[in-house]
Amino acid sequence: MTSYKNILAVGAHPDDIELGCSGALMKFMEQGANVDIVIARDDNAPKPSVQRSRETTLSEYQASQEMLGIEFVFMNNPLTDDGRPILEWNNTNIEQMDRLIARRDYDLIITHSPGDHHNDHVNTYRIVNSSLRRYQGEFWLMECCPYANKNQEFVPTVFVDISDYIEDKIKLVSCYGSYFTDTLLHNIKNLAGYRGQMLNVEYAEAFELRWKTIR
């Protein structure tokens, strides 16, 4: 069994990590790993003019933080009035990510797949990928339902058995109740079941291994 000491998961928005890799993170934490979560937008909630209020947005991701026992680290990418982050692939964001990655000796970093059809996800991948010039650990791309496998095929090469964590994963995603429907929760569980069949277990999360360094 592979053992990880320090793991960094990077999502474009609060909820992305819960969707894509929270089962694996909970499993690795139980095995003793230190886990950090970085969100590419900043921590100011959207203005009240958009669909969800500040209070709702804050309470949702704070509930997820409490369940995970991890305080999210937010980057400095402000939100527009419609609630979307100004998230660009540029030197400023790459330098921010450089500093975040330098905080620990990470042996596993997880982020979005460039095949996601959400532009914020694609730019988050680009920022992380650009900051791994000297990184020598493993780099995984997560499958973030419902945004995955649209721009290019997601080809999973790593499967993590999350059978013991699937209900907690659903509870984490349910923290974002203002915009995740019961149908989406059902589909997330179905996807985990489909990936589990590939591993001959009940539920699994799938990842694409971008690279692995053996020292």
Q: Which ranges hold each PLM region?
A:
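The feature marks non-catalytic terminal segments
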Residues: 2, 103, 138-215
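Active-site beta-strand->loop->alpha-helix modules in alpha/beta enzyme cores, enriched
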Residues: 1-14, 18-138, 199-202, 206
